[in-house]
Amino acid sequence: MGRIISPDALILVAVMTQLRDLEIARLFGWYRIPLKTAPKVIAVDYLAFYQTGSFGADKWRIQYIAQVKGHELTTRAELLQDQPDHPRVNEEYYKVQIGSLQELLPPIPAGKWRRITFFYTTGEYLQDAETVNDLIVHSEDRQILWTALRERLDKEQTYGIGDQPEVELEDEVLAALLGIQGQ
């Protein structure tokens, strides 16, 4: 992808620590963020994935982005069912549904940066970036970014899932679906 993205797109730079996480994103279309370390706003337009040192020759760069389709709160146990003994198995995570991974050509190298946490940027900065440092929103544009983030935080993001049919359920069926016992 030649970095053609709307200049006003809101982008969350997210940390991808393991190749397995990249494969989950590519094959299953989701990315996980621990609730206790999550940024305040998850309802963004895109995720840009910063690859850590565990990626070998592809380390310390942003090589992929993906459009955000929605998000939900769940547990690590639900997300990674093959890890029932993990120390954080019962902790809450955001499961961010994403579209297909789009490769950035060329990728955006970290430059001098190595340790990165979540941060926000815009499509305009992504298009022009030569290094990760170039993604940092400058003071003159920071107010625009914070206003966009506040707007996303103040109202729930809609992800364009289209019209959903209304379904009428009997009280017993609804109670069963919600796990509510009869009184």
State what each model feature region is:
Residues 2-183:
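Structured alpha/beta reader/binder surfaces that contact nucleic acids or chromatin modification marks
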